[in-house]
């Protein structure tokens, strides 16, 4: 089967935050400054004293100032914004002729939520213990999630629903399994995004927002980090193997090893204007084959089968004792943020995830599977996103996003694509599978 499809996205989940509130002086000037990048937005409160800022970067810190003629300027420091939520503040200005030692500050009145949900910040991720640095380890901070399995077998259930009922997005763009071939429901075999590159994860279970839909379990929106005026980064690595796993009911743990390493770096290209953020991560997991030892009475017949296929069809069937190469993944993220002016900014995000996994056809125990019966299960997902966030006027704000996604899954038998599937019964009654996988697909989406 060969399928080719290129996906374009024009609608997506929110990737920004907003600030709203009121001030006791209509017409007062409200200024919001994002300290890490130096970007600012200013607006005058309306006749009712209300103000609103949208399209802001999640996180912070922000500084909010309010000023008006004849009044002392008030300032609120260390404001941190929640992804896809409106953060509310009430500010009281005091006449400049009032007693000097009276101090009045802005008061945070709360967060206007779009429904039941939770937010996981980069600090939460850094402080949470995790075996495989998988998304599920951090989502289970919310008790409405149930997590089963690890690595590529992880299943994330929200409110008791099937894990495929979730909608998972990265920077507002869907990253779900388009074909239903991955047990985890993601568009990748392992983690769909390195958690070291995430700024916040927003989870919604029953939102009343037109921007959130296409799910029956949870809407999980992960937003990546951006560069700031500070050049900073880190190199990291972690690994585990069977010696770090406790016995389950006294049963031995099969041998395995899993290693992850990578780096992240971000900073300014042009101070206060243009910023970059780059992340790279590679993972490798190895588990020895569970091939059974070859019984003495079967070895001669297996060798005879191998020789026959080579002499008659020039087909190399391999051998039943086979250790597949390690399962591997490479992830690359490049993000550029450009502040055109105080009211307009654009983003470009490039993400590429490549998985390679060698699998064998499911079989009953006590059967011999030749190496030619294994197949390569590769996934390559490349995404380019262009976004515009701006204020057209005091009453109109716009967020536009265009995404191009190319998804490839070219499955290929190690024994080649032009030799059919066969099962051979040995004299001992056991089966031998010396030929290619019976299911094969070449998929481009």
Can you name each region flagged by the protein language model?
Residues 134, 153, 188, 198, ...:
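Transmembrane beta-barrel architecture of outer-membrane proteins
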Residues 121, 183-187, 202-204, 246-249, ...:
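Extracytoplasmic loops and strand-loop junctions of Gram-negative outer membrane beta-barrel proteins
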Residues 10-103:
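Periplasm-facing N-terminal accessory domains of Gram-negative outer-membrane beta-barrel systems
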Residues 207, 237-243, 282-286, 352-356, ...:
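Transmembrane beta-strands of outer-membrane beta-barrel pores
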Residues 232, 254-356, 379-398:
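Transmembrane beta-barrel wall of Gram-negative outer-membrane proteins
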Residues 199-208, 216-221, 229-267, 278-281, ...:
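Short strand-turn segments of transmembrane beta-barrel domains in outer membranes
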Residues 46, 72, 77-90, 101-226, ...:
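Periplasmic N-terminal accessory/gating domains of Gram-negative outer-membrane beta-barrel systems
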């Amino acid at each position: 089967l060969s399928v080719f499809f290129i996906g374009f996205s024009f609608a997506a989940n929110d990737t920004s935050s907003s600030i709203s509130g009121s001030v006791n002086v209509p017409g007062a000037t409200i200024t919001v400054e994002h300290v890490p990048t130096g970007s600012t937005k200013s607006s005058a409160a309306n006749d009712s004293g209300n103000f609103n800022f949208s399209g802001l970067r999640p996180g912070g810190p922000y500084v909010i100032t309010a000023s008006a003629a004849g009044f002392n300027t008030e300032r609120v420091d260390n404001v941190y914004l929640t992804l896809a939520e409106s953060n509310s503040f009430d500010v009281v200005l005091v006449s400049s002729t009032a007693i000097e030692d009276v101090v009045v500050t802005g008061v945070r009145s709360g967060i206007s939520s779009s429904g039941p949900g939770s937010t996981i910040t980069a600090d939460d991720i850094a402080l949470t213990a995790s075996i495989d640095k998988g998304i599920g380890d951090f989502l289970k901070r919310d008790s409405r999630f149930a997590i089963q399995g690890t690595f590529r077998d992880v299943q994330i259930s929200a409110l008791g629903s099937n894990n495929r009922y979730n909608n998972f997005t990265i920077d507002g763009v869907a990253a779900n399994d388009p074909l239903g071939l991955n047990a985890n429901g993601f568009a990748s075999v392992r983690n769909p995004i390195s958690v070291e590159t995430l700024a916040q994860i927003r989870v919604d279970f029953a939102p009343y927002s037109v921007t959130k839909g296409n799910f029956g379990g949870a809407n999980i929106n992960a937003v990546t980090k951006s560069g700031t005026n500070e050049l900073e980064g880190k190199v990291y690595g972690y690994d585990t193997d069977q010696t770090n796993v406790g016995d389950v009911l006294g049963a031995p743990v099969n041998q395995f090893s899993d290693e992850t390493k990578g780096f992240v770096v971000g900073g300014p290209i042009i101070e206060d204007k243009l910023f970059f953020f780059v992340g790279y991560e590679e993972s490798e997991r190895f588990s020895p084959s569970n091939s059974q030892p070859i019984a003495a009475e079967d070895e001669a017949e297996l060798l005879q089968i191998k020789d026959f296929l080579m002499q008659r069809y020039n087909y190399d069937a391999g051998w039943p004792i086979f250790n597949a190469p390690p399962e591997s993944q490479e992830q690359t993220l490049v993000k550029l943020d450009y502040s055109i002016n105080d009211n307009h900014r654009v983003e470009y995000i490039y993400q590429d995830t490549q998985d390679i996994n060698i699998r064998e056809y499911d079989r009953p125990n006590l059967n011999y599977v030749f190496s030619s019966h294994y197949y390569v299960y590769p996934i390559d997902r490349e995404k380019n996103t262009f976004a515009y966030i701006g204020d057209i006027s005091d009453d109109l704000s716009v967020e536009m996003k265009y995404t191009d996604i190319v998804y490839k899954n070219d499955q290929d038998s190690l024994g080649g694509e032009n030799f059919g599937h066969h099962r051979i019964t040995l004299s001992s009654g056991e089966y031998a599978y010396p030929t290619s996988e019976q299911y094969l697909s070449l998929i481009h989406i």
